[in-house]
From Swiss-Prot:
Biased composition (Low complexity): 119-137
Protein induction: Positively regulated by sigma B factor.
Gene3D superfamilies on file: 1.10.530.10
One GO CC term on file: extracellular region
Gene Ontology molecular functions: hydrolase activity, acting on glycosyl bonds
Species this protein is from: Staphylococcus aureus (strain MRSA252)
Protein name as catalogued: Probable transglycosylase SceD
Length: 231
């Protein structure tokens, strides 16, 4: 299940988290009550939606009784999700894709199953698609990339799948809970770190699709898919 929330009000939030100094650790390195957190996540305990599990920035991932759980915060936004261990793409209690002007990057929708949607691709350029296992080992498989419809930027298959899960491909989507916006559900701080100077401080949802695509490709190429919990 993926939730993205403001500290006063999911990662992703990362929806998406990038460049924030903080405390990142696997759950095995921290004194966490895995059983309690797992039970709260499985029951969609509203406490997880109302406040972070601890103060400050953190990033915890652990396996418990057949499921993988993830809890994170950049100190302002916080998120959590879980899925069956080893599952590829289907969160057990998932993020609902955004449509029109309501779009969770990581969100409050309960018991909605994420689906990967892959548009037909024509071979042009190749970029690696990272697939990360629970022990953080990464294997790369090739993905094709081509320009998005309405954009001249080459976007690889993996990013297109991320865009579908994050916003349904809606470039004007906005998550009213987390503030994440645009086709790739950027948080404003993340957007400002990769957007052209002209669009820094501007909501991603108000930027042209080609600008959003270019920013997403830049973020993906510099940090991989880890910026998106739905990846």
């Amino acid at each position: 299940m993926k939730k993205t929330l403001l500290a006063s009000s999911l990662a992703v939030g990362l929806g998406i988290v990038a460049g924030n100094a903080g405390h990142e650790a696997q759950a095995s390195e921290a004194d966490l009550n895995k059983a309690s957190l797992a039970q709260m996540a499985q029951s969609n305990d509203q406490t997880l939606n109302q406040k972070p599990i601890e103060a400050g920035a953190y990033n915890y991932t652990f396996d418990y009784e057949g499921f993988t759980y993830h809890f994170e915060s950049d100190g302002t936004h916080f998120a959590w999700n879980y899925h069956a261990t080893g599952a590829n793409g289907a969160d057990m209690s998932a993020q609902a894709p955004a449509t029109n002007n309501v779009a969770p990057s990581a969100d409050q929708s309960n018991q909605v199953q994420s689906q990967e949607v892959e548009a037909p691709q024509n071979a042009q350029t190749q970029q690696p698609q990272a697939s990360t296992s629970n022990n953080s080992q990464v294997t790369a498989t090739p993905t094709e990339s081509k320009a998005s419809e309405g954009s001249s930027v080459n976007v690889n298959d993996h990013l297109k799948q991320i865009a579908q899960r994050e916003s349904g491909g809606n470039i004007h989507a906005v998550n009213p809970t987390s503030g994440a916006a645009g086709k790739y559900q950027f948080l404003q701080s993340t957007w400002d770190s990769v957007a052209p100077a002209k669009y820094k401080g501007v909501s991603p949802a108000n930027a042209p699709e080609s600008v959003q695509d270019a920013a997403a490709v830049k973020l993906y190429n510099t940090g991989g898919a880890g910026h998106w919990v739905t990846a």
